[in-house]
Amino acid sequence: MIYLDYSANTPVDARVLEQFCAVERRCIGNANSHHQAGSAAKAEIDAATIKIASLLGVQPAEIIYTSGASEANNFALKGLARLSRHAGRHIISTPLEHSSVSGTLTALQEQGYEIDLLDVKQDGTVDLEHLKDLLRLETISVAVTLEDSELGVVQPVQEIAAILKAYPHCHLHVDATQAVGKIPVSFEGVDTMSLTAHKFYGLNGIGLLIKRRNLALEPLIHGGESTTIYRSGTPTVALASSLACALDLAVIDLPNRVDHVAKLNAELRAALSTYPLVRINSPEHAVPHVLNLSVRNVKGTVFQRELDAKGVCVSVKSACSSDGLPSRAVFAVSRDRRNALSSWRISLSHLTTEDEIKAFLQAFDVCCRELTALH
């Protein structure tokens, strides 16, 4: 099997799994309990929180553990909407967002909130002039992905934050899920930020919402204080510790990982550009981990299925998106519905080998010849 879907899920690093198992065996107490075992568990999760905060450049009190980025996005957007409902009911986002953002905004729209989506330029970045046009006194939040999962384009978050300084009632939520481990991530100018461990070689089931200390968001899960008043439940100490380990490894090895992936991306671009019917949708300035392409007149789902039959795993849109609909991100940059329907994504890793790239290109060549001959 050739796995080229690392944007959907990454395999857990052996060192991260070892950390999880060691802490799970050692810390048997509930971190909320007032005895020796509970104190030991609390000390472990506090140490993990301090480490994570240091790596992300935030305060430990700004970290809320969640089950993943989907919960964190729901928590942030619903919490900000409720917090600011007396100031306004207008929210701005983009057509590039993960379904946990777009779905939450749809739910808020059904509750009477007004949602506007930013235009996306041909380079894949949001139109800042359109943002300025859409902003008004009733705008309570802007939700934007730091790096979109389908094209790999990094959005101008710091420029957005600078624009929002003129709107004191408007908060900025950033979904950094795809960015962690691929680019440096900053919380500067941001009010809430989401991420999840399974995108950077950690375990599934643990994520973070980073929240400015002065924001009093209503919890999604009630029931008493845990590691924070904002999320009830017994904290999973080993998962928190494993996230800290995975994040540490991702930050330390970031330059080497990016260099390796960039070389593979360049090889793919060079090889795929020789096919007249292939259109590469990811801009040159996108992160090298993601390469989105279309094969003219062949639906992305069909091409994915043929590659899968040959042992190659790629993705059509986000793994959490609905099937049968064109990619919103690709349509936003190309304005071509047929091209968006034909699009699919290769996502690379520092674990991807040269031999895997060669084998993929061989499988691609066979699929391309077979499928384009039918049209």
Give the location of each predicted region.
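Pyridoxal 5′-phosphate
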Residues: 1-375
